[in-house]
């Protein structure tokens, strides 16, 4: 068996395209190999701005053999009474590619039928790949693709070379006017010539000698080590930014860092502005001293090693100075206005075409934070902070700085609020209310920030659902899934035990006045939130059964629902959980068949056996203890108390016919089971486990 190498050489591919393209290409090729019955080993992908490559180990030389059974007509039609094949039998043999003597009689359950075992021919892997690779390569998805020349070919950037080797054998195919070959191109500036590959295995070493590190992980390690060495030489530390490392890593074929400088006068700008300007426009790494204070220098990573790197450093410094001069100008222009001035300008900024302006959204946020303040029993000081933070929360969207650097929204609002003398918590809330800005990101730390963040996300959710802008499949242009999870995470982390239902209904009321429509949209949103909470907790490691069982009872109190799920998930690990669950499921199922819980109280005078009396007495004793546990939020203890009822429930089912012909006895026994069901129904629906 040989290793398979496929490399697509191209003009500069955008950094963000590389990893998704490699993942897709790998999936498509392995699926094609599997579908063609070609066994193979591990896969590895490699990529730079100038190449996308895939290596598949231990690829079988040809398809695995496969036998299939072809069924024909019944035996009575395929053969005559003398056992000779009829015309139908002969035709079947011809169709199967066999002689009549090779026909097999098979009983398929409907009687004897003609059949034939066909062994499919095994094609060479080389031939199969040559046929499918052009299509697989052109099927790689990109955010944007392009045509070039007069060719009927699309790709992220023009394809300049194709390398395809199965061991030492070249796989021959063409895409457009580019034919596959056994060579690769080296570094586009330092070794642009062709390098012949003796085999697929020589790929990485050949490229290393040609100035290219194609292994993304290896190149990333070299990048991190080299920028650290450059920072150490400048007596500085790098401002950590792993995302920027990934971006820069896919901008170069080999990293060559250099330290550049800018004028100290720009250090008057907020750190976030300096870092963002260097990062977003130039992909530079900001540097700080040992105390964490930004220094007037940075690291730029080049794709080539120049003869005089000092000249390169000066060039980078000249470029960033122009960027920082613009930022400094915008900063000073913004400081001539107050955040309250900016609020008025929000009237001209559209939130969403169907949902009004950002000024109107600000008004809704003020209403929602006031409502939330009541739900969390906020004191007057917190209420005041919330109202002010809500009013100023979107003000920086019209600032010159955010127009230039959109990622600074909230951050620059916090900076301007601090400079304007706002309460520190109000200023911080302006930044925090966007959190989490990505899945797994930091949550707000201040109470004002937490409540404002919930209000903002709730308003967006209610507005989009009211305008029928509901996520479908992979499409979620307003990030409603992320915002929903943000609401749930903040409520859970902060221990906010107010009713999510009350919050959603208040949010929807700002968009809908019709009661029926309000109820319909609120129900949709709550189901959406329930789905997000289910996925969130399953991702955290809780069993889906435990999550569904607990949330089906209620999820409006998020911290309470989490405690119930946690307790139930722990109980599920106990060895005697299965019989316990079975007993309680039986209780639920009997009640369901009878049309639900009994509407009458238990009448002890109707008990006619010890099992009824024992269960009733135990249930009464347990109920009191369970209520105490639930009030304390100790659902683990509550479930343990409830589990003590299992022997009594089992005994009742063994000794008593619940669905007795005597109506009075039947109703009384249903009432007894209803009292048992009421205990665990406060925690979870055991029928879903």
Swiss-Prot record:
GO molecular function term, any single one: glycine-tRNA ligase activity
Keyword Zinc annotated: no
Record note on quaternary structure: Tetramer of two alpha and two beta subunits.
Entry-linked Pfam families: DALR_1 (PF05746), tRNA_synt_2f (PF02092)
Name of the protein in question: Glycine--tRNA ligase beta subunit
EC numbers for this chain: 6.1.1.14
Keyword list, A-Z: Aminoacyl-tRNA synthetase, ATP-binding, Cytoplasm, Ligase, Nucleotide-binding, Protein biosynthesis
HAMAP family registered for this protein in UniProt: Gly_tRNA_synth_beta (MF_00255)
Family matches, as InterPro entries: DALR_anticod-bd, Gly-tRNA-synth_bsu, Gly-tRNA-synth_heterodimer
Coiled coil regions in record: none
């Amino acid at each position: 068996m040989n290793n398979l190498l496929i490399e697509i050489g191209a003009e500069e591919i955008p950094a963000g395209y590389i990893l998704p393209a490699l993942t897709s290409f790998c999936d498509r090729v392995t699926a094609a190999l599997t579908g063609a019955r070609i066994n193979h080993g591990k896969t590895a992908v490699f990529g730079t701005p100038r190449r996308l490559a895939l290596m598949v180990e231990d690829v079988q030389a040809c398809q695995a053999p496969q036998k299939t059974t072809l069924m024909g007509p019944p035996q009575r039609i395929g053969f005559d009474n003398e056992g000779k094949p009829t015309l139908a039998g002969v035709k079947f043999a011809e169709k199967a590619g066999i002689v009549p003597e090779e026909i097999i009689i098979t009983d398929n359950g409907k009687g004897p039928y003609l059949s034939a075992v066909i062994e499919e021919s095994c094609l060479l892997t080389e031939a199969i790949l040559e046929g499918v690779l052009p299509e697989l390569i052109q099927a790689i998805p990109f955010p944007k693709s392009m045509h070039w020349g007069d060719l009927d070919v699309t790709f992220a950037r023009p394809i300049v070379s194709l390398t395809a080797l199965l061991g030492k054998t070249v796989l021959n195919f063409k895409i457009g006017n580019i034919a596959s070959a056994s060579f690769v191109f080296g570094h586009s500036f330092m070794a642009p010539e062709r390098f012949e590959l003796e085999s697929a295995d020589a790929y990485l070493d050949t490229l290393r000698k040609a100035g290219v590190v194609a292994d993304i992980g290896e190149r990333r390690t070299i990048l991190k080590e080299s920028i650290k060495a450059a920072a150490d030489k400048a007596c500085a530390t790098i401002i950590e930014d792993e995302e920027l490392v990934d971006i820069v890593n896919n901008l170069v074929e080999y990293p060559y860092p250099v330290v550049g400088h800018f004028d100290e006068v720009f250090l008057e700008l907020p750190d976030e502005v300096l870092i963002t300007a260097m990062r977003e426009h130039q992909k530079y790494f900001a540097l700080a001293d040992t105390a964490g204070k930004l220094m007037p220098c940075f690291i730029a990573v080049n794709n080539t090693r120049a003869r005089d790197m000092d000249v390169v450093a000066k060039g980078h410094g000249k470029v960033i100075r122009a960027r920082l001069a613009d930022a400094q100008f915008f900063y000073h222009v913004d400081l001539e206005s107050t955040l309250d001035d900016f609020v008025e300008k929000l009237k001209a900024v559209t939130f969403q075409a169907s949902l009004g302006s950002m000024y109107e959204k600000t008004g809704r946020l003020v209403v929602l934070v006031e409502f939330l303040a009541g739900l969390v029993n906020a004191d007057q000081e917190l209420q005041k902070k919330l109202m002010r933070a809500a009013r100023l929360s979107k003000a920086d969207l019209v600032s010159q700085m955010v127009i230039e650097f959109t990622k600074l929204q909230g951050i620059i609002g916090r900076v301007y609020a601090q400079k304007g003398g706002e309460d520190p918590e109000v200023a911080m809330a302006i930044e925090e209310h966007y959190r989490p800005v990505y899945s797994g990101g930091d949550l707000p730390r201040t109470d004002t920030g937490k409540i404002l963040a919930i209000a903002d996300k709730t308003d967006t959710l209610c507005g989009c659902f009211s305008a029928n802008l509901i996520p479908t499949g992979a499409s979620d242009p307003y990030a409603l899934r992320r915002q929903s999870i943000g609401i749930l995470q903040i409520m859970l982390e902060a221990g906010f035990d107010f009713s999510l239902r009350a919050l959603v209904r208040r949010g929807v009321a700002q968009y809908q006045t019709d009661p029926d429509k309000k109820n319909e949209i609120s129900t949709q949103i709550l189901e959406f939130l329930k789905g997000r909470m289910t996925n969130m907790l399953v991702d955290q490691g809780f069993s889906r059964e435990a999550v569904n069982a607990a949330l089906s009872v209620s999820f409006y109190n998020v911290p309470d629902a989490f405690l119930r799920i946690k307790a139930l998930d722990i109980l599920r690990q106990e060895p005697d959980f299965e019989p316990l669950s079975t007993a309680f499921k039986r209780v639920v199922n009997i009640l369901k068949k009878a049309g639900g819980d009994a509407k009458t109280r238990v009448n002890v005078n109707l008990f006619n056996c010890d099992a009824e009396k024992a269960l009733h007495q135990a249930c009464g004793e347990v109920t009191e203890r369970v209520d105490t546990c639930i009030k304390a939020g100790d659902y683990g203890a509550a479930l343990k108390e409830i589990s003590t009822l299992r022997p009594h429930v089992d005994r009742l089912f063994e000794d008593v016919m619940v669905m007795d012909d005597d109506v009075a006895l039947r109703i009384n026994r249903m009432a007894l089971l209803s009292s048992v069901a009421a205990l665990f129904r406060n925690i979870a629906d055991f029928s879903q486990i």
